[in-house]
């Protein structure tokens, strides 16, 4: 399959707005803790979103609390109606719930509004 592309189309296709950024730059993870709580915060770059259902912990099943997050419904081409998060997603876990955990790994997935979706990303927290 060969497609003809004129020079103005090439310029648009290779422009900075179509650049695929590393997931770490798009979904920046920050960890904060004190004696009572442990918080994980994602700063999500403008023009991107994370799937709420994609956020899972390996070997950890206790509840966590969602803070400072704007969750909205989204009609996804592949997943249908789903919940997504834009800008900030923050969760809080009680420190005492982590005492019996050897390590904490969280996984998540998100996409750009231009249509590029990142593979599931795993991030070691502890």
Question: Where are each of the predicted segments found?
Answer:
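Structural recognition of alpha-helix starts/caps
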Residues: 1-126
């Amino acid at each position: 399959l060969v497609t003809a592309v004129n020079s103005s189309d090439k310029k648009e296709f290779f422009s900075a707005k179509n650049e695929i950024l590393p997931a770490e730059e798009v979904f920046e993870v920050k960890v904060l803790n004190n004696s009572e709580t442990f918080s994980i915060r994602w700063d999500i770059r403008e023009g991107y979103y994370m799937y709420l259902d994609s956020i899972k912990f390996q070997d950890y099943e206790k509840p966590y609390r969602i803070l400072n997050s704007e969750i909205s419904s989204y009609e996804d081409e592949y997943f249908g109606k789903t919940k997504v998060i834009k800008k900030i997603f923050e969760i809080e876990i009680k420190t005492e719930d982590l005492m019996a955990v050897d390590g904490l790994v969280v996984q998540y997935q998100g996409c750009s509004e231009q249509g590029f979706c990142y593979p599931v990303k795993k991030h070691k927290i502890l």
